[in-house]
Amino acid sequence: MPSITGLTAAEVEARRAAGQTNQPPKSQTKTTGEIVRDNVCTYFNLVFLVLAVMLALVHSWLNMGFLGIVFWNTLIGIVQQLRAKRTIDKLTLVSAQKLRCLRDGQWCEVLSDDLVQDDVVEFGAGDQIAADAVVLDGSAQANESLITGEARAIPKECGAELKSGSFLMAGRCVARLTRVGAESYASRLTAEAQADGHRVARGEMMRSLDKLIKFIGVALIPIGAVLIWKQHWVLELSMKETVDATVAALIGMIPEGLYLLTSVALAVSMMRLARRKVLTRDMNCIETLARVDTLCVDKTGTITESTMQADDPLPLAENTPITEILSAFYAGGQPDNDTARALTARFGQGGTAWAAVRTIPFNTAYKYSAKDFGAQGCYVVGAPDVLAGSRAGELADRLTPLLAQGRRVLLLAKYNGTLPDPPAALDPAQLEFLALLPLQNRIRESAPKTFRFFAKQGVKIKVISGDDPQAVSHVAANAGIAGAEHWVDAATLQSEAALAEAAEKCTVFGRVTPEQKRQLVHALQAKGHTVAMTGDGVNDVLALKDADCGIAMASGAQAASQVAQLVLLDSDFAALPGVVAEGRRVINNIQRSASLFLVKNIFSFLLSIVALALPLAYPFQPLQLSLVTFATIGAPAFFLALEPNHELVHGKFMRNVLRKALPGGLTDFLLVFCAQGFGYAFDIPSDMVGTICTLVILCVGLQILWGVCIPFTPLHWAIWGSMTVAGVGGVFLLARWLPLVRLDLGGTLVLVVLLALSAPTLAGLVFMGERLHGMVNDWKNKKARKHV
């Protein structure tokens, strides 16, 4: 290495003072101020404030009780998200990329965020380039597909530029950082994308909630204005009665707890995953996890342990100093993958003094590494079937038994030709086969149990590896993966159509290139599958990035950890069932809780529209709805969101929620409308009609909660029982403040009739909804079969 000097401590401090640090322009998590602002300064909190002012102006102090719920909702949201932020920030620091940096003449490890401009840094295979740099020494091959989309190895020699966001596929080099932080290439690309309006895609659930919130937000203002006009100037109610009724109607239409529950549930889920040593880089991936039906895994580091052991070489030629050749080949090197590390540990300690005049580092594209020792000869180590090519039959008798044992096998050969520049496939005719180098990984003890879990959950496993397909198939079968006997050599899949067909039919894929891994992910996604991809190597980066959910092992290549949405900090594949179960738990419970919230919103919206069209006043006061909301929606939804739920999520979020919420919302609307009709027909006082309506929707709400709690568990019994006591107890204890009035004989008869009708009405609407849902699904299935 030429004389290279790094920065001194004083120079580092000077650059920090000048702001020339590699700090990212924006933190991965929100700041404390952003969390407080986003929870306090919301559109609906502004609406609640305006409604409270309206109530204050007419001295309706008791009906301002909903502000207490708003306050506690906001406080809970802030506290939970701050807790999640602290946990995620700690894990982010633990998982941050560390690089070798030359400072004060000494090599030391420095976090990528702590680098400064002009730092001298060493990059190896699997490292992501942390900032723009220029190569000072060494040679490597970079992949810039993450920033340019072009998936090819680009040689980087002395003087070449390294772009931030790219990663090294092979080799090792020393470089000086030229542009850091916001000035780097990757940061400028991100800033331009944000300036053009591009944002990280939100999950289907959050997009659905955003649309619902926007619709309600737009509808509130005209409905509220017309309600005030109708009730005060047309029905000639007093201003206090008008404001009370209008505020109640608008509060009924606002899903005040739904968005909060969703945000808090996702934040808590990130925190729960963090406690399991799983770093979540993107909150949206939690929703994706709940929908995963296909899991793509690598063999090494996932099914097997990441560390490999090199066995004794099997000579193929007589009187050849195999150990001496291997000692020279691996002596003094810096291995950049598990295979090289195992061979270096076994053979590279002897220190045979052969000087290499040219070195080709291993690359997944051509699957060999080579060293030219001049007079001592040129030697290559790589995949036997790839190197031997048309001569592979000469190795079959010795190679096949090893592959059947699940071994990884490399070929050591002498190359009598000239090494290609740039690296490319070698001429098999120029090879002298010297030895087979068998290596082995132990299957992780937890692997069979983990794969049984996924099989039980209906998740298909696809094993995608760069190794020989027969060897991978043997390992997969021993790990208990169903369909492991269905394997294919990806080298034979010469078209996208052939690869797409194999993606559906086969379980094990061997000799897969990094680009083919990505194509396999795309093929599975094109068939409608939600794909999670696990990996730890530089050859997994492209597939991890394009999978619906990329899951990286922290012990693997830094580039893999940087592009994945989830990082297993313990690098333990056994953690995955818990990760998937957490995703399903939170999304299923949010979906179930959302159906409770929307019942109130649906019936209140329909009732408001009817109140505008007919000579009927809105029958509720804000405090009455607050009691019903607490007992049948808010409190039970919170507790239901905490329990386990491992069911695979199917269908669209909003469609699923509306299918559950519409029967309840329509039941409330029909019964309340009937109560108003009876009141209008029999001249029942408005306060008595309001009491009847409150008791009716409380009863319907408890029936809906009963349906949600099926099948009943001790927790479900506790939730339903306590909410029933809270609702009924609130009616008796808070009647004076709600206000609820004593019913006369006519009012009592109306209440009894409506309560008697509530259960059959709800059951009938649920039955009709399920029948309609089934008919639509049958029609879709028939239509799909016609197109097959």
Predicted regions and their residues:
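Cytosolic catalytic regions of ATP/NTP-dependent phosphoryl-transfer enzymes
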Residues: R291-E432, L439, R452-F453, I461-S473, ...
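Helix-interface capping motifs at the ends of transmembrane segments in multi-pass membrane proteins
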Residues: L46-G68, V218-I254, M271-K277, I602-P622, ...
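Membrane-embedded transport module
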Residues: L227, L266, G483-A532, A547, ...
